[in-house]
Swiss-Prot record:
Protein name: 23S rRNA (uracil(1939)-C(5))-methyltransferase RlmD
HAMAP family: 23SrRNA_methyltr_RlmD (MF_01010)
Binding site for [4Fe-4S] cluster: C83, C89, C92, C170
Residues reported in the UniProt entry to bind S-adenosyl-L-methionine: Q282, F311, N316, E332, D359, D379
InterPro entries linked: 23S_rRNA_MeTrfase_RlmD (IPR001566), MeTrfase_TrmA_AS (IPR030390), MeTrfase_TrmA_CS (IPR030391), NA-bd_OB-fold (IPR012340), SAM-dependent_MTases_sf (IPR029063), TRAM_dom (IPR002792), U5_MeTrfase_fam (IPR010280)
Domain of life per record: Bacteria
Gene3D superfamilies assigned: 2.40.50.1070, Nucleic acid-binding proteins (2.40.50.140), Vaccinia Virus protein VP39 (3.40.50.150)
Family note: Belongs to the class I-like SAM-binding methyltransferase superfamily. RNA M5U methyltransferase family. RlmD subfamily.
Active site: C405
Role according to the record: Catalyzes the formation of 5-methyl-uridine at position 1939 (m5U1939) in 23S rRNA.
Catalytic reactions on record: uridine(1939) in 23S rRNA + S-adenosyl-L-methionine = 5-methyluridine(1939) in 23S rRNA + S-adenosyl-L-homocysteine + H(+)
Length: 449
């Protein structure tokens, strides 16, 4: 049978044309949502109630994406971004929205996701909020050596790219660390080994400022001397991390960063937590303290109670819970962090606290050390705790505090708890990352009587 050529619609023209859109809300990733020819259109950078000019960049069956070209009618929440690297650096993505607007959006998005995907409606509590700028106590900067210019660039990666955007300061990084970026860029370019340097990690700890330089080969004596001189001049602890993951202090002594909790709680003795660069630690010190305090308030640990802390890390929640008198069992999947947690417990003189390494997706309910659990705290990674909840149903703890860095997995896991007879009592936003779309939350569940 003969087949005749039929011209397809010129989709490239449709994609390249600039069009006007009315934005009515934000998605949970912070992109503006509009409607166009029966499709949802996602427009990063656009805000609710705005009329914008945008260019379609992607067409799918049920949705499309567009690039913001111009804001024709701005929202009352639109502000001028303060960072000169905004939109080139891949870090912040909501600086164009007021801080109050960001928090209102995040709180509403959290409630909406929980209601839509878990059918859960709890009593919303005030969001945990802090400083909007200079809040990060830790950051990892990427390096890129240009073989042509023989220069090393230091900065953050562009959004969805391996490209390094050179920066000389960062408005969300703790001020002392931000002030070190430009001097470090100059220093690293003076080293003979600059072509073999990896990332630079900066840490603002309670016992000083730290820098970790990833190296792929040993540095010569002159380079080591320059690093030691820089460290002394800037009053910073510098260590090198080699290919084996080992750390070496440039002055021959390795000092690890420390932060304290409960130091602002009346009548409580502070706990100190030491951590190794590279291991997970909450980057917002102010919000972390508030988050731990809220978890303690909700769980109200009492002497004689047994509390299970899953995904316990190096003891961020475990140590304060034990300090207030409960018997705490911490379980973590990363062996190095279990070792660090045990060292932290010993350093703080806590004998009512034990840590175990375990596969949290496996059934741990029959482990000889598990026993009866009165209360449970969960602080999983973005993937959530779905597998863990399958065996935790046997434990039937009276209360569950779930700390989440992903509202989607929180909603999915909440549905499991609700099916097991729990009721959502409290739900609140944790604004751990101002100027970004990231939503963290804490939820309290209680077993129905």
């Amino acid at each position: 049978m003969a087949q005749f050529f039929k011209a397809k619609p010129n989709s490239s023209k449709q994609l390249s044309a600039k069009q006007s859109f009315s934005v009515h809300q934000l998605d949970h990733l912070g992109a503006g949502i509009a409607q166009h020819q029966g499709k949802v259109v996602f427009i990063p950078g656009a805000l609710p109630s705005e009329t914008v000019q945008a260019q379609l960049t992607e067409q799918k069956k049920n949705y499309a994406r567009a690039k913001l070209i111009k804001v024709e009618t701005p929202s009352a929440e639109r502000v001028t971004p303060l960072c000169p690297h905004y939109q080139s650096c891949g870090g912040c993505d909501l600086q164009h929205m007021s801080l109050a607007g960001q928090r209102e959006h995040k709180s509403a998005a959290l409630v909406d996701i929980m209601a839509k995907f878990a059918g859960a409606e709890g009593n919303s509590v005030p969001a945990l909020t802090g400083e909007g700028w200079h809040y990060r106590r830790r950051a990892r900067l990427a390096t890129l050596f240009d073989k042509n210019t023989k220069q090393l660039s230091l900065g953050f990666r562009a959004s969805s790219s391996n490209q390094v955007v050179p920066i000389d300061s960062c408005l969300v990084l703790a001020k002392p660390l931000s002030d070190l970026i430009a001097p470090f860029a100059k220093l690293l370019n003076q080293l003979a080994a600059k072509s073999s340097l990896g990332h630079l990690e900066l840490i603002d700890a309670d016992n000083g400022h730290f820098a970790v330089i990833r190296i792929t080969k040993s540095l010569n004596d002159k380079d080591m001397a320059k690093l030691a001189q820089f460290a002394e001049h800037h009053q910073i602890h510098i260590c090198l991390q080699d290919n084996n993951g080992e750390f070496h202090g440039v002055n021959g002594t390795l000092l690890l960063p420390v932060y304290q909790l409960l130091d602002d709680k009346a009548g409580a003795t502070p706990v100190s937590l030491t951590f190794t660069p590279g291991n997970f630690v909450q980057v917002n010190a102010q919000i972390n303290k508030a988050m731990v305090a809220q978890a303690l308030d909700w769980l109200a640990p009492q002497p004689g109670e047994r509390i299970l802390d899953l995904f316990c890390g190096m003891g961020n929640f475990s140590l304060p819970l034990a300090k207030l008198g409960a018997e705490v069992i911490g379980v973590e999947g990363v062996p190095d962090m279990v070792s660090q947690a045990r060292e932290n417990a010993a350093a703080n003189g806590l004998s009512n606290l034990t840590f175990y390494h375990g596969d949290l997706s496996a059934d741990l309910s029959c482990e000889p050390w598990m026993g009866k659990i009165d209360k449970l705290l969960l602080d999983p990674a973005r993937a959530g705790a779905f597998e863990s909840l399958q065996w935790l149903k046997k434990m039937k703890p009276r209360q569950v505090v779930y700390v989440s860095c992903n509202p989607a997995s929180l909603a999915r896991d909440s549905a499991v708890l609700l099916e097991r007879g729990y009721k959502l009592q409290k739900l609140g936003l944790i604004d751990m990352f101002p100027q970004t779309h990231h939503i963290e939350a804490m939820a309290l569940f209680e077993l129905a009587k």
